[in-house]
Curated annotation (Swiss-Prot):
Stated role: Involved in the biosynthesis of the anthracyclines carminomycin and daunorubicin (daunomycin) which are aromatic polyketide antibiotics that exhibit high cytotoxicity and are widely applied in the chemotherapy of a variety of cancers. Acts jointly with DoxA in the conversion of 13-deoxycarminomycin and 13-deoxydaunorubicin to yield carminomycin and daunorubicin, respectively.
Protein name: Anthracycline biosynthesis protein DauV
One GO-annotated biological process of the protein: daunorubicin biosynthetic process
Membrane-crossing segments per the record: none
Residue span(s) of domain VOC: 8-136, 150-263
Gene this protein is translated from: dauV
SS bond list: none
One Pfam family recorded for the sequence: Glyoxalase
The keyword Plastid belongs to this UniProt entry's keyword annotation: no
Length: 275
């Protein structure tokens, strides 16, 4: 299992108004296996595995703030929004909460222990993009990333990259740097010289608010898009070739945005060098 360095994207879950329906959609789309956590205190939290390795999860969404509606008030069908959340690894969720407040972010959910699995908190950056942090307990995070069937990349979709540069450096220790690649102008976030996340200009998708976007690695972007539509999803941006690979932007049946991409190269998670 990967040991995630502080600041690296470590876990990904979907907040949904209908966990069972969302599980059906994503297992049908990616071939995942869904497993409901047996602990009664988990509230039906359902994990997704690809080839036996944890990749993501879905939970009943119980938080409704403007931060959780990046596609506006219409991105739900059951009174609650649906959204993917990126969790960044941290060694101390409580200390990071203080850094978020100092840097001008908002605390949506104060640090809390999660069934002995770890400790989490939920924040929003100064532009309103929601994200979470994860202090590992017995659960490290995703057991695989960067390969088809798992999260391949994450992006900050924002209209204020200048403020984001300072905020994420001060809170998560992310260092923004230009890619140096032809056709890619938005900065990429690094940890120890390892690229871990990207940025995208707000307005390139149907989103109306800043947010963190999740991109799933797939073998065939076009076939995945067709399958998503068959399962009740919709297309925000049709497949297009990009410097990072062929990608498309989608909405699931409950309005949660996500992307699929045929990565030209895998982006490894920033691993913690501790033994």
């Amino acid at each position: 299992m990967t040991r995630f360095a502080p600041g690296a994207p470590a876990w990904f879950d979907l907040g949904s108004p209908d966990v069972a329906a969302s599980a059906d959609f994503y297992t049908g789309l990616f071939g995942w296996t869904a497993t409901v956590v047996s602990d009664p205190g988990a509230g039906g939290y359902t994990t997704f595995s690809s080839d036996g390795k944890l990749v993501a999860a879905v939970a009943r969404h119980q938080i409704d703030t403007p931060y959780h509606r990046p596609y506006g008030p219409g991105n739900d069908q059951h009174g609650m929004p649906a959204i993917w959340t990126v969790y960044f690894a941290t060694n101390d969720a409580d200390a990071l909460t203080k850094r978020v407040e100092t840097a001008g972010g908002d605390v949506i959910m104060t640090p809390m222990d999660v069934l002995g699995l770890g400790r989490m908190a939920v924040f929003a950056d100064p532009s309103g993009a929601a994200f979470a942090v994860w202090r590992k307990g017995v659960m490290e995070g995703a057991e695989v990333t960067g390969v088809p069937g798992s999260v391949g990349w994450v992006e900050l979709v924002t209209d204020d990259i200048g403020t984001a540069r300072g905020f994420y450096r001060a809170t998560l220790g992310l260092a923004p740097a230009d890619t140096g690649r032809k056709g890619v102008t938005d900065p990429v976030w690094h940890i120890h010289d390892t690229p871990v996340a990207g940025t995208r200009e707000l307005g390139t998708t149907g989103a109306v608010r800043p947010h963190w976007a999740v991109l799933f690695s797939v073998h065939d972007c076009d076939a995945t898009v067709r399958r998503a539509v068959e399962l009740g999803g919709s297309v925000e941006n049709e497949p297009v070739d990009t410097p990072r690979g062929r990608r498309a932007d989608l909405l699931d049946p409950h309005g949660a945005g996500f992307s699929v991409v045929e990565l030209r190269e895998a982006y490894p998670a920033a691993a913690d060098g501790a033994s």
